[in-house]
């Protein structure tokens, strides 16, 4: 493994200050993986400033390997996530470590640890409208925040919404995020996001903004209630089959749900983003007032985990529960 002070590439130099993670950080367990790389739970034990006691800390470390030609994508992810991180419903991102290796670069992002993981478990279980209202209320708060900053998340799917051990919903993974300035440019050259959650304007290679996230929120709501992607009509579901649904102006049925939920969905379903609700407008929907409490969804989620035999490390004995924000 090579190490250097700076990458030869141009861009955000804070990302490319080449340095490995501190030796006292101990990656303890893999808690996630995918095409991007992997996420490790890290234990950090160090003396406090007075040298009187050991501080125990836990956080997540997202490790990404990529060719150096893609460095601008990682810089965009880090910059947009960092800009948006100061909100209760956005997963906090801290310091970034980077190293070079033969095939390119390895970036290690320090992230807040969300012990209950993503919403896959909730989606695969009996989910009540009040649970989904709680999720939506928290996410809309996060979306108002990032949209006010001129950022669109771009991939509002089940895998990218996390929950902490206290039951707080967190918007995560800004890999598809970008500024309105960039996304509003028409004729984008690529379709980004998760099939089923991608807004029609993105599928049609048009310019888009924060309202694309509201389309994703509507599909996320139905996904949680139905237990699968509501656009899925057969065994195989991919981008091409989703494009067909979009070309036919299809939208999943939601007529068997309560009136407040139907009204909420109606505000998010329009194929024309001009007539689709904004995050701020959606925040006033009656449906959100039917939300369960934080303690209710936390207890429900914990019961589901016990039923499934899931036992990720539980951060109850941690003296410090924070994310490093500077290189050490």
Swiss-Prot record:
Residues 25-288 form the Protein kinase domain. InterPro entries: Kinase-like_dom_sf (IPR011009), Prot_kinase_dom (IPR000719), Protein_kinase_ATP_BS (IPR017441), STE20_Ser/Thr_kinase (IPR050285), Tyr_kinase_AS (IPR008266). PROSITE patterns: PROTEIN_KINASE_ATP (PS00107), PROTEIN_KINASE_DOM (PS50011), PROTEIN_KINASE_TYR (PS00109). GO terms for molecular function: ATP binding; non-membrane spanning protein tyrosine kinase activity. SUPFAM superfamilies: Protein kinase-like (PK-like) (SSF56112). The active site is at residue 155. Keywords: ATP-binding, Kinase, Nucleotide-binding, Transferase, Tyrosine-protein kinase. It comes from the Eukaryota. It catalyses: L-tyrosyl-[protein] + ATP = O-phospho-L-tyrosyl-[protein] + ADP + H(+). Belongs to the protein kinase superfamily. Tyr protein kinase family. This is Putative tyrosine-protein kinase C03B1.5. It comes from Caenorhabditis elegans.
